[in-house]
Amino acid sequence: MGLLDYQTIKQDFPLLQTKMNGRSLVFLDSAASSQKPRRVIDTFANYYRCRNANIHRGAYRLSYEATDLYDQTREKIARFLKARSPVECVFTRNTTESINIVARSWGEANIQAGDEIVISELEHHSNLVPWMMLAERKGAVLKH
């Protein structure tokens, strides 16, 4: 695979066509909220217009269709990530929620008093705080 042309990729992201103070927008807060390519925006808009229904619990056609789309998406993601099973892929709202789930589940089960939790000094606040709180609860040491 050759180098990616960032200008071509940038064209797929509508918000990145915005000018701020007369200059092209550069968005560097993707840990908090990543920008979406046009294809994702269009796919979600179509889903909400035509397919939005409860998944895995409705007993009507639209719910069955939404469930099928959800399950197919999970299977595609599992293949892309080379997961052993689609059930290994968990959907969350965002990175913040995901890292909190990891810290509150894996961290609670595995971190013990005196253990060292090592993170980068460059971490986003949403990745720093869950580990700080876990270290405090467990008597572990947070290093960065």
Language-model features: locations:
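Pyridoxal 5′-phosphate
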Residues: 1-144
